[in-house]
Amino acid sequence: MAKNIQAIRGMNDYLPSETAIWQRIEGTLKNVLGSYGYSEIRLPIVEQTPLFKRAIGEVTDVVEKEMYTFEDRNGDSLTLRPEGTAGCVRAGIEHGLLYNQEQHLWYIGPMFRHERPQKGRYRQFHQLGCEVFGLQGPDIDAELIMLTARWWRALGISEHVTLELNSIGSLEARANYRDALVAFLEQHKEKLDEDCKRRMYTSPLRVLDSKNPEVQALLNDAPALGDYLDEESREHFAGLCKLLESAGIAYTVNQRLVRGLDYYNRTVFEWVTNSLGSQGTVCAGGRYDGLVEQLGGRATPAVGFAMGLERLVLLVQAVNPEFKADPVVDIYLVASGADTQSAAMALAERLRDELPGVKLMTNHGGGNFKKQFARADKWGARVAVVLGESEVANGTAVVKDLRSGEQTAVAQDSVAAHLRTLLG
């Protein structure tokens, strides 16, 4: 007997019992994006490997350890996208969307990283990202954060996420800080773990993000990034903070927040939660004003963020159980008796025409009334429309409210109007 083929570790199937809540959450997110005037862009899952090496940075964990890279039949090195920003910038340059233009874009889809699978973090995971091009003031940074705050309110999780902010300054300011940080770390090398020693010269700002308690204690005496900011970055950050305060959005300045990708400058932010066990990031982003030019385009200011949907779904389910999936079926059409099926299917099509927003399922495979009503319950239907031989003969149908048990005989021409009243 052939061995069953199973899904790859860390790449999950999402079954109908799970996708319904995903659809409702994604619908909520997309509605808010539409209310801000953002447009969807759809991007390839596979890109040329040099795109990510140039955008993310060759000495980052993502590029060094986590990318799914392979050679195609033409000998080209290709990579399954580990994040969405690089591909979005590439598309913007390629199609002439960016130079001297303003773009407000969003995308959604699977990303791939070869990490150790754990709760809320998988090798194939789903992200929703937002990218804005052509605007350099702190007001657009603030709008993106306000947009995310509106998401949390719509999903009922506002009390379970907190905002952390930082400014990592200009490239020049960061280079000066990097030198000071490396000098400090060299003086205390014996207190660093092996991972921090490796990062000390390749990506020293990532040491600030270490989860090692001993390293974190050491960093209390390290030079502060805020002391090395250029004046323009200070003004930008102060403007952002003022806008958030005016909007009533609470935040904490975290001077060790640097983000794991090399393309960021100035504003960086994360929404974090403690409601899934250990602290986890729900949504994160920042400015990347140099990335478009770095990838071959003309200098264009840019800011954006990305959010992992697996972790967001877990959070909504954990803290807001009242946020339930929409029912799969609103109306279940029950038909029993000789020659009733064709009449039932014709009525179902007419009702779909007259009630386009309603989800209606027709019973197939026969069965007595008891079995068919059991199927209606299984699918979560609120109402059953019943056709038997007598109803077909006299042009009526029975409409039954499956919650109250009340039922009414209605002329078939009036069924849609009756259902509209019943379903509200």
Swiss-Prot record:
Highest taxon of source: Bacteria
Enzyme Commission designation: 6.1.1.21
Biological process according to GO: histidyl-tRNA aminoacylation
Reactions catalysed, as given in the entry: tRNA(His) + L-histidine + ATP = L-histidyl-tRNA(His) + AMP + diphosphate + H(+)
UniProt keywords, alphabetically: Aminoacyl-tRNA synthetase, ATP-binding, Cytoplasm, Ligase, Nucleotide-binding, Protein biosynthesis
Pfam families (alphabetical): HGTP_anticodon, tRNA-synt_His
Amino-acid biosynthesis among keywords: no
Main location: cytoplasm
Record-linked InterPro entries: aa-tRNA-synth_II, aa-tRNA-synth_II/BPL/LPL, Anticodon-bd, Anticodon-bd_dom_sf, His-tRNA-ligase, HisRS-like_core, HisRS/HisZ, HisRS_anticodon
GO cellular component, one term: cytoplasm
Coiled-coil residue spans: none
Disulfide bonds: none
One MF annotation (Gene Ontology) recorded for this entry: ATP binding
Assembly and oligomerization: Homodimer.
NCBIfam families tied to this protein: hisS
Record family assignment: Belongs to the class-II aminoacyl-tRNA synthetase family.
PANTHER family, alphabetized: HISTIDINE--TRNA LIGASE, MITOCHONDRIAL-RELATED, HISTIDYL-TRNA SYNTHETASE
Protein name: Histidine--tRNA ligase
